[in-house]
Design a protein with these regions (language model features):
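Polytopic transmembrane helical bundles with strong interfacial aromatic enrichment
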Residues: 9-11
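Central hydrophobic cores of alpha-helical transmembrane segments in multi-pass inner-membrane proteins
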Residues: 68-78
Length: 310
């Protein structure tokens, strides 16, 4: 091969690689945009930041996957040995340029992901302050120092396997009602084991630790009915430990408070109790499990059959 052919070959290789990288970037961008549709609706101020990070990581993952798959496919298609050729390949080993590339590229990607993730985590922390108290003795001090929010806490009480929400107005509910576009303050409390306070539409997942109180705040931004799930394996019926989260206008929220505070308390929502009763009727067979905690008394048991948006 003469010099001219060698130069043309290198130019063709560079053009081919550039075109392949360009196509990879386009497909990665399309996949990143598509990833938004895989997630539930965005219903809190935190949701867009989490979704953007997810899309960013999806795009990077797609670029790496397609790039590696493309190289493997190219080698399989165009660098195979001729038919019936059983000779050994050339003993090629070591390529400093290639080793530098495959060291620097992952390093750059990891640093980029770390910087972006840290930025998102900082933003989420600013949007929803979170503090863990190891004993209830520390809570009064916090409330004294934060009088503006002291009367706005909604106590989220988790049990095996039911949810209870106690409001500052002195009543409780099995469903969580909150006003749109207003910061809502929670105190997360567990009565038995570790539970997970998980609302996919809010992009919120917080462990609830027994013996501790965790204060948390968020701002819902979209009206609708969403789903609160127990994301921790808290026992046999943890998957049934779900309830609705209702985001409504300020007027509708206040109207619900005025009605609910006058209601007589009844047993709260407890799907696990129903399932455990059926188990006993069948002879209590299968893996051993503890009985569900008695349902809490609430002013509004809610409607478990209401349609929700994830």
């Amino acid at each position: 091969m003469n010099l001219k052919d060698n130069i043309n070959s290198k130019i063709s290789l560079i053009i081919g690689i550039t075109f392949a990288v360009f196509i990879d970037l386009i497909l990665s961008k399309l996949m990143a945009n598509w990833s938004y549709s895989w997630l539930p609706v965005q219903a809190s101020k935190a949701a867009p930041y989490v979704d953007n990070l997810f899309a960013f990581e999806t795009g990077i993952g797609t670029f790496i996957f397609l790039g590696c798959s493309g190289v493997i496919g190219w080698v399989l298609l165009f660098n195979r040995a001729p038919k019936y050729d059983e000779s050994y390949g050339e003993p090629i080993e070591g390529n400093v340029k290639l080793e530098i590339v495959w060291t620097l590229v992952p390093l750059f990607l990891v640093i980029a992901i770390a910087i972006y993730s840290t930025k998102v985590n900082t933003t989420l922390q600013n949007l929803g302050e979170k503090t863990k108290y190891d004993s209830q003795k520390e809570l009064p001090t916090y409330l004294d120092n934060n009088e503006a929010s002291a009367g706005r806490f909604i106590d989220v009480i988790s049990r095996q396997w039911s949810w209870e929400f106690k409001y500052p107005e002195g009543f409780s509910s099995s469903e969580l009602h909150i006003p749109i576009n207003e910061k809502v303050y929670f105190r997360l409390i567990s009565k038995d084991v570790i539970h997970g306070f998980y609302i996919p539409a809010f992009r919120l997942k917080q462990d609830i630790i027994p013996g501790s109180i965790i204060s948390y705040s968020l701002t819902p931004t979209r009206k609708g009915i969403y789903r609160l799930r127990d994301s921790m394996f808290s026992g046999a019926y943890f998957s049934q430990n779900q309830t609705n989260v209702i985001v409504e206008s300020k007027d509708a929220y206040q109207e619900w408070i005025n009605k609910t505070v006058k209601k007589v308390q009844v047993d709260g929502l407890n799907q696990a109790g129903f399932l455990y009763k059926k188990r006993l009727e069948k002879g209590d067979k299968g893996w051993a499990t503890i009985p569900p905690a008695p349902p809490p008394l609430v002013n509004d048991p809610g409607d478990p059959d209401s349609p929700h948006e994830g």
